[in-house]
Curated annotation (Swiss-Prot):
PROSITE patterns: PH_DOMAIN. Residues 310-331 have a biased composition (Polar residues). Keywords: Cell membrane, Cytoplasm, Isopeptide bond, Lipid-binding, Membrane, Nucleus, Phosphoprotein, Repeat, Ubl conjugation. Binds MPDZ and PTPN13. Binds specifically to phosphatidylinositol 3,4-diphosphate (PtdIns3,4P2), but not to other phosphoinositides. May recruit other proteins to the plasma membrane. There is a cross-link at residue 141 (Glycyl lysine isopeptide (Lys-Gly) (interchain with G-Cter in SUMO2)). It is found in: Cytoplasm; Cell membrane; Nucleus. This is Pleckstrin homology domain-containing family A member 2. Residues 7-113, 198-298 form the PH domain. The gene is Plekha2. Residues 363-375, 400-410 have a biased composition (Basic and acidic residues). InterPro entries: PH-like_dom_sf, PH_domain, PI-Interact_SigTrans_Reg. It comes from Mus musculus. Residues 310-425 are annotated as: Disordered. GO terms for biological process: positive regulation of cell-matrix adhesion.
Amino acid sequence: MPYVDRQNRICGFLDIEDNENSGKFLRRYFILDTQANCLLWYMDNPQNLAVGAGAVGSLQLTYISKVSIATPKQKPKTPFCFVINALSQRYFLQANDQKDLKDWVEALNQASKITVPKAGTVPLATEVLKNLTAPPTLEKKPQVAYKTEIIGGVVVQTPISQNGGDGQEGCEPGTHAFLRRSQSYIPTSGCRPSTGPPLIKSGYCVKQGNVRKSWKRRFFALDDFTICYFKCEQDREPLRTIPLKDVLKTHECLVKSGDLLMRDNLFEIITTSRTFYVQADSPEDMHSWIEGIGAAVQALKCHPREPSFSRSISLTRPGSSTLTSAPNSILSRRRPPAEEKRGLCKAPSVASSWQPWTPVPQAEEKPLSVEHAPEDSLFMPNPGESTATGVLASSRVRHRSEPQHPKEKPFVFNLDDENIRTSDV
């Protein structure tokens, strides 16, 4: 939406066709300056650009003959499109919605009207000649401190303020060359996949840094529990996450000083540890963010709850899988009791299993009989030991690495028995 800034200029984002009949529209920040009698467009809000970054295009208002809504025949696939006719050239621009389209067309037509000056306002010819003959004086440019860095083998000079911090207009070069068309919207299914609760509001805003106090454009996303901002819309990991339970207040920033004095549509998010200064693209967008954050904080206070997606994220971390534990639990529940008991016999208990450093118990135990012990089991009974009934009398069986328990009879066979085999002797 176009808005009026502190210098009484009409500002806002529009999409302009790169070349006539090319069909390629680029996102630009437009400033309609009636005092300078021109329409300017920049890569982004000049407050967010580097010092010295000028307009990428301009048009004198006196050259504009007509501003009208584009017909479907002119731009059949471009909604909310209007055309500026100037000097036998046409400029096609695209607004965000119908109201934005109507406001821009009315503002441009009003600014480009030819007005007849009143009597006494026309300058005298002598004054005009005097101004023309006067030699132009070179304006003395203010001295600006620069910080020189070597990035990737290239010398980069960044303007800084005298207090040692970043410049007020510090910004990454080339960051805003490809701005998204929609600056604030509820994302659809084709956007960045959401891994948490559904988003209440999302869009691009300009945020002040905490350390260097530089202003950079970030993609903000608001859900039921947090406010996150990303470097761009396609990023999956946020640069920072602000829990809504830590937000104390969100309102328009009315008390401004220093760099904040020239910022329009500025609001602040006050938390327990820090105050975030965020600049929206229009007053409507600013009030929408303030109302959305306030409503989410109030809903969280009235109905406190934990995010339900935290456990699902922990279960699907890299290196683990939710499918590995679920089938095992299902199979263990469906397994027959005998089979389950046999599986448990193979896994020694940590509390009761024998270890090499454990002393051999002196009390005699009755282990599992040979006929009931599996042949391939690691837990074997002592040779020759068996109960008369063949019933397991002990709670655990001896592992093959465990020493045998001392016996009263050193030889377990009776030599007078006629049924004894020679191999047993």
